[in-house]
Amino acid sequence: MMWRWTLMLLLLLLRHWALGKPSPDAGPHGQDRVHHGTPLSEAPHDDAHGNFQYDHEAFLGRDVAKEFDQLTPEESQARLGRIVDRMDLAGDSDGWVSLAELRAWIAHTQQRHIRDSVSAAWHTYDTDRDGRVGWEELRNATYGHYEPGEEFHDVEDAETYKKMLARDERRFRVADQDGDSMATREELTAFLHPEEFPHMRDIVVAETLEDLDKNKDGYVQVEEYIADLYSAEPGEEEPAWVQTERQQFRDFRDLNKDGRLDGSEVGYWVLPPSQDQPLVEANHLLHESDTDKDGRLSKAEILSNWNMFVGSQATNYGEDLTRHHDEL
């Protein structure tokens, strides 16, 4: 039925967007395949020109940063003061904000969108409301309910969807560490955001290999790598950026210089060693605000530099406030 096809396609698109799965339509330079972890902000880090939006989103989270942009400077500073108290209370409650406490707060903010996305998925998938998400619940919520042997008989490209279903089940089994076919919230998070969990690394690599390894020899050849980035038209000259990608493949992707990528090289490419982004931002905020250079921040130091930490009507960029909260 057409309604089932439309609903299933919408669910798949929404969930696969949320999962951060490697996209078979990765754009130039292959950025869609590289998992850098959760970014602190998509805004440019441009403090030199008085643009503190990156810092605001790193410190508050994107949605809350928008809320602050609608406050008066006085309201913004008052709420920042309460955040400072919470940061110190979560640490050693000594009246100062240490580098570790600042980093912990930013890391907490960084993970908020993951928690929110998992909560939304949990509500969708836990159809019997028993506090767990079974594989059958997830499968039926995503793909629709079918009798055995009739899977996808009513949709176009049934074989593609059968492969997607098998791939999702394999990922679910890896995320389901206790093997009971019921996902806890932590296990569902691993299923939805595998790049955040070391034990999911192999499945991310396997899925990437399956997408790129067209001749099924277990490796990614340079032409397979390029084909994922660029589809040439007949007679079209290869763009300069594609030639640059070939060089990138040779110089930086193919670590053992055998002309192809094995599983470990694919893993190093799509899941590179990550920088501790919260620590980098915490050091930056500490450096910019620690006026007495004692290696920690007082509440007064933070409030005196409040426009770097948070925004207000005086520093906003014209965003419309889409939701309201009295407290964080």
Swiss-Prot record:
Region (Disordered): 24-48
Residues at which Ca(2+) 6 binds: D290, D292, D294, R296, E301
EF-hand domain location: 75-112, 113-148, 163-198, 200-235, 241-276, 277-312
Residue positions binding Ca(2+) 1: D92, D94, W96, E101
Cysteines paired by S-S bonds: none
Keyword Thylakoid set for record: no
Leader peptide range in chain numbering: 1-20
Residue numbers binding Ca(2+) 5: D254, N256, D258, R260, E265
Assembly and binders: Interacts with PCSK6 (immature form including the propeptide); probably involved in the maturation and the secretion of PCSK6.
Protein name: Reticulocalbin-3
Species this chain originates from: Rattus norvegicus (Rat)
